[in-house]
Amino acid sequence: MTTPAAPRLRIGVMGGTFDPIHNGHLVAASEVQQHLQLDEVIFVPTGQPWQKQTVTDGEHRYLMTVIATAANPRFTVSRVDIDRAGTTYTIDTLRDIRRTHPDAELFFITGADAIQQILGWKDVAELWDLAHFVAVTRPGHDLTESGLPHADVRLLEVPALAISSTDCRARVGRGFPVWYLVPDGVVQYISKHHLYRSPQ
């Protein structure tokens, strides 16, 4: 008599610059984890994003992400993009995660604005083979199921938090507080390491 196969792990992959990571990222990941019953959400800070010229050092962004996610047992952080040389592309991220989790069902979590541009991403045809895609929207966003670029993209509305990393950096640069916009430990990390002191 054969024993039934163990169910496949369901793993979310949330890539981002996380410069800095903020509460909007965490709420989105938590909502997706709950709605899709994911076993784990892996946060993957990008190394050198292909669409951005200047970002804070990867080690700082990695450590802020570790601090921000530490309290949630379903959240982990991967260094695959930080440690890989060269420009970061989603296809490389998913190939690396697939190598370390060969039997898992992967769900790549991204914003609705990014998903509308996905057809221009590197090796887009292979992306659909590596993972399902989850497009996170906020109430009032005009993206609908009919506007999705591929059948294997799921639309999920999450609570609206009008927070952006760009605004957080600018606030720090102007001497304004970012308490309650980013996790407390990240606020302290930014202060300790004098990040974002010049307006960006």
From Swiss-Prot:
Key words of the record = ATP-binding, NAD, Nucleotide-binding, Nucleotidyltransferase, Pyridine nucleotide biosynthesis, Transferase
> What biological-process GO terms show up in the record?
NAD biosynthetic process
Gene Ontology MF, one? nicotinate-nucleotide adenylyltransferase activity
Q: What class of enzyme is it?
A: transferase
Q: Which InterPro entries match?
A: Cyt_trans-like, NadD/NMNAT, Rossmann-like_a/b/a_fold
Q: What CDD domains does the entry give?
A: NMNAT
Q: What is its EC number?
A: 2.7.7.18
Which reaction equation describes what this protein catalyses?
nicotinate beta-D-ribonucleotide + ATP + H(+) = deamido-NAD(+) + diphosphate
Q: In which pathway does it act?
A: Cofactor biosynthesis; NAD(+) biosynthesis; deamido-NAD(+) from nicotinate D-ribonucleotide: step 1/1
Pfam families xrefs: CTP_transf_like
Family membership:
Belongs to the NadD family.
Query: What's this chain's function?
Result: Catalyzes the reversible adenylation of nicotinate mononucleotide (NaMN) to nicotinic acid adenine dinucleotide (NaAD).
PANTHER family from the xrefs? Answer: NICOTINATE-NUCLEOTIDE ADENYLYLTRANSFERASE-RELATED, PHOSPHOPANTETHEINE ADENYLYLTRANSFERASE
Task: Report what the protein is called.
Answer: Probable nicotinate-nucleotide adenylyltransferase
